[in-house]
């Protein structure tokens, strides 16, 4: 096992920390959104509230530690540091693919982090494609029970699997199997991409199948075609991956598309999120929760305190943004007219 899934997880972490793994000339699209400064905000900064909720639990901020890793010695340190920090700051917390945990108890501590985060909304994760490779509702429920998680998210990563040496490529007829997971698992089931994005048409099909929430995981941050290109030992795969160095739908476009199709669905924005200003922009165009992944990874390699400092900076940046437009809570931020999208001010409407 150490030379299989677990080794791959360690390689992924190392490459995300040290490699050139962002898409080429690909952004989140959020740079096209600008806030219109309010010189007279008429609020007290001390009154600004970031309180939110997700999966039926209260959050101190509308933030999620997005799925990153699990199933290796290095992942154990990372996930435990993230769990301690998420509990302290009141964030939601997701862990990386739990397939390795279903197959072996090796490095189980990287997944068993509920003790470090007893009250945080906890999400476990497995590839949706595994529903075509022997996994089903029973395995999904088992991993929820083993980790005492609040939810499971199925990740859609077709292009990553295509580029990955030995990837699982049978994505045929997954939707009815996803629907069965939603019907049989006794917890909310979400779906996320891994950095290439989910649009409104796909989100509608998933939501109609019973999915509880959508994480768009758009382009503009880590490109898994580039991560797998750096890992690949196959010259043909490596060369082909280069053609996909700017593949994917930008996070901003995903949010607009999904929110337009599903006005009421719980929506997570992730993919290239680096600042609290990014988060504010995402919330303004439809996100309920904002996920951060690689932006937290370097700190998670150190200590929980390092992660907490990074989290506190993101929270402060979000509060400063809200102060700058006179929004005292997230509802006011969502409904603000003090935003310009691609040069079109909502204040003019």
From Swiss-Prot:
Annotated catalysed reactions: isopentenyl diphosphate = dimethylallyl diphosphate
Keyword Magnesium: yes
Keywords, comma-separated and alphabetical: Cytoplasm, Flavoprotein, FMN, Isomerase, Isoprene biosynthesis, Magnesium, Metal-binding, NADP
GO molecular function: FMN binding; isopentenyl-diphosphate delta-isomerase activity; magnesium ion binding; NADPH binding; oxidoreductase activity
Signal peptide: none
EC numbers on record: 5.3.3.2
Short name of any one Pfam family annotated for the protein: FMN_dh
Chain residues that bind substrate: 8-9, 97-99, 160
Enzyme class label: isomerase
Record's subcellular location: Cytoplasm
Domain of life, per lineage: Bacteria
GO BP: isoprenoid biosynthetic process
Entry cofactors: FMN; NADPH; Mg(2+)
Binding site for FMN: 66-69, 97, 125, 192, 222, 272-274, 293-294
Residues holding Mg(2+): 161
Family named by the database record: Belongs to the IPP isomerase type 2 family.
Subunit structure, as described in the record: Homooctamer. Dimer of tetramers.
HAMAP family: Idi_2 (MF_00354)
Functional note: Involved in the biosynthesis of isoprenoids. Catalyzes the 1,3-allylic rearrangement of the homoallylic substrate isopentenyl (IPP) to its allylic isomer, dimethylallyl diphosphate (DMAPP).
UniProt cross-references to PANTHER family, sorted A to Z: ISOPENTENYL-DIPHOSPHATE DELTA-ISOMERASE
UniProt name for this protein: Isopentenyl-diphosphate delta-isomerase
Organism: Oceanobacillus iheyensis (strain DSM 14371 / CIP 107618 / JCM 11309 / KCTC 3954 / HTE831)
Gene name of the encoded protein: fni
